[in-house]
Each structure stands twice: as C-alpha cells, then as structure tokens.
Amino acid sequence: MFVRLARIPRITRHYRLGLFSTQPKPKPNEYLYYRNKHKSKMEAPIKRSSSAVSLVELEREPFKVTVIGSGNWGTTIAKVVAENTKANPQVFQERVDMWVFDENIDGTMLTEIINTKHQNVKYLPNIDLPENLVANPDLLKSVEGADILVFNIPHQFLPKIVDQLRGHVEPHVRAISCLKGFEVGKKGVQLLSTYITEELGIECGALSGANLAPEVAKEHWSETTVAYHIPKDYQGDGMDVDHKVLKLLFHRPYFHVSVIDDVAGISIAGALKNVVALGCGFVEGLGWGNNAAAAIQRVGLGEIIKFGQMFFPESRVETYYQESAGVADLITTCSGGRNVRVATHMAKTGKSAEDSEKELLNGQSAQGVITCKEVHEWLSTCEMIEEFPLFEAVYKIVYEDVPMHKLPEMIEELDDIVVAGQ
C-alpha cells in the first residue's frame, strides 16, 4: 500500500529518516520513492507529472560520490551527478569530489580555476558547474570515504589509475564505468567494468548512450543507459546501491536514464561504435556522401552484434536495438564527435591519426584509434580477422597506411555477390 503525502502550497511535509521536517517545494519531474509501511523493501519509483518530493529512505548514511576524470565527458557527468546529489540530500552527500589530472592554465592550476570560477575552462568551457562539485588533484584523497565511484577517463589510463587505487577502496564500494574500450591482456579481451571489478574487488556497472558531451552539458534533452548487476553481497533496500539509487543519481529532466542489467551489451556497443565512427569519418572526408556513411553504419552494426555474441554471449541482442547505448549511440557518434572529426581530418589532409588528434582535440583522444588496435590484437590472437572486415579495414587505414579509397573493397562481402550467368 502506497502512502500518499499531503500536498500543501509552497511547503511539502514528509517524514525523512524518521524525523518530521518541512522542506521547500521541489522542482517538477523529480522521482519519488515511497516505502510501503507494511513491507521492508523499497517500492519502485513513481514518476510524477507534477511537483513531488524525491524521497528514498535509507537505513544508513547518505552515499558519498566521487567522479574520477575531468575531461569534457567526465566533467559533464560530474555536473549531472552534483546536481542530483544536491537535489537529494537524503540519499547522497551533497559534495561530489572530481579527480582532476592537474594542469597549469596560463599560470593557474586547473583545479583552482574549477573550484573558484566553477568552470572547466580547458575541457568544458563556458559551462557553469555546481558549487558542490569540488575538483581534487589528489586521487586517493578524492576517493576517501566514497561509496560510489564514477570512472570517466580515457580508457588507456585505466590500468595506471587502478594500480594507484588498489588497496585504498573498500569492498562495499560500488562503481559505474563511463569508459569506452576494452582491456586486452593475458586474460583475453575484457570489459572495462569487469577489469575494474576484478582489480579492485568492487561491483562495477557501466553508463553509455547517445550522449555527445557538449549537448548534455548544455542541458539539451538526451537519453542514456546505465547497466548494473546487483552483486551477491547486496545489503538490501535502503542499505546499498541498486537500480533505483542509480537512476536517482544520473537522471535529470534533460538526461533521461534507462537502467538495465546487460553490462556486456552496452559496454560492447559503447566501445565498438567508435571504430565504426572512424569509418564514417573516412568516407565523409573523401566526400562520398550519406549513402556511403549509411553503408558503413550497416556493416558496423552487424559486426558489433557479431562481436558481442561471439565473445560475450551473455550480452543480449535486443540491447543493441532498444537502448540508447546501442543503435542510437552508433548513429549519434557516426554523425559527429571526436572520432569522425579525426578521421575526416585524416582523409582531407593525409595526416596520421596521432597528428590529427593533436591538432583537433586539445589534449584529448579519439577512443576509436586505440580500440581498433585492441580489437585487431584480439582477433589476430583468435585467428578471426576475416570475420570482421570493417574493424580490420579501419585498423589497416590507421596503422598500416592502407589507402582509404580501398575501404569498400576491404569490407565487401564476396560471398554475397551473384554474377549474372553463373
């Protein structure tokens, strides 16, 4: 039985953590969690079309959240998270630490600029950040006491970050990876969320979707997908992180969140779409038009699904079609973003991927450049390169200087050709 709370103009009265209190009337479109008086577990969220109190009753202290990473996507997610921790103090500690790889910007350290001017002038300029978002250049201090870690760094730096964190993160901590890519090593090809789980001994999910950081930062409406497995050591409703808590942490009126449990599916789609986007950038730079870009996306989607089913059979095909992290993210990434920009620049100038990144990305990287190499290494080990002609074609263009105009013949499916009269 749900308990309906009385609505009084300007002041909403409710019980929070067992104490009767009054709070200002909240903004519309927030989520309300009611605890059924006759059940111990927390009920599912009820979306209100009108103003409502966003209430989750915890039987523990509010969760402390730390974001690891401060690039344009890292800062954008930190902005989203800090807005939600401030709006939901009964669930989250208001302060959000954001670990920053500190840099000198015209004589002032980047962390100081973020904490005084509340803008990341290098990676997310002209976007105001919440004052409860605190930049911290010390990785270990930033995660001290954290209950939820949000990883959002270029994935090639993850092993170094994990090495520094090892032994400093408690087993009860939960994590979400916003990284795109794979870890290829002695254990084969691993999801980055799995790598974090195994190396740090904490449960880690993933966030991915059709999310170009500048658009999310400007609060233009978009969707995303969060995937998280409830771990075996789950402490129960009101005591631990679950799908409801994660939705409350990431959902904003301009950033709609779907929470599922297919971590593998959204991670694979999020990593491999960057490789496909390089292919789209090549044909754009060559001036081949929309038909060619559509062909690249068609082949790319097929190879993404095949890769998932072949190497991560726990992933679900419907995730690629139904979730923002699937085909929607593929379309968005192939329409713009770093990978397309870098590949287009390569096609127009003849410059390498490395030089193009340096010229265009202000110290950041196009993740597809690294991912296509990781995928090539794994497929070579498995002797399955021929099963993924687009992924291999992108690798050869980037790393072996194969001419881009050969792209169609490299991905052509010869077995499907029917020659008249034969």
UniProtKB/Swiss-Prot annotation:
GO BP terms in the entry: carbohydrate metabolic process; glycerol-3-phosphate catabolic process
Domain of life: Eukaryota
EC number: 1.1.1.8
Enzymatic reactions: sn-glycerol 3-phosphate + NAD(+) = dihydroxyacetone phosphate + NADH + H(+)
One CC-aspect GO term: nucleus
Disulphide linkage map: none
Entry annotation: catalytic residues: 273
Binding site for NAD(+): 69-74, 157, 180, 213, 338, 367
UniProt-listed PROSITE patterns: NAD_G3PDH
Any GO molecular function: glycerol-3-phosphate dehydrogenase (NAD+) activity
Residues annotated for substrate binding in this entry: 180, 338-339
Residues of the signal peptide: none
EC supergroup of this enzyme: oxidoreductase
UniProt keywords, alphabetically: NAD, Oxidoreductase
InterPro entries registered for this protein in UniProt: 6-PGluconate_DH-like_C_sf (IPR008927), 6PGD_dom2 (IPR013328), G3P_DH_NAD-dep (IPR006168), G3P_DH_NAD-dep_C (IPR006109), G3P_DH_NAD-dep_euk (IPR017751), G3P_DH_NAD-dep_N (IPR011128), NAD(P)-bd_dom_sf (IPR036291)
Record family assignment: Belongs to the NAD-dependent glycerol-3-phosphate dehydrogenase family.
Protein name per its UniProtKB record: Glycerol-3-phosphate dehydrogenase [NAD(+)] 2
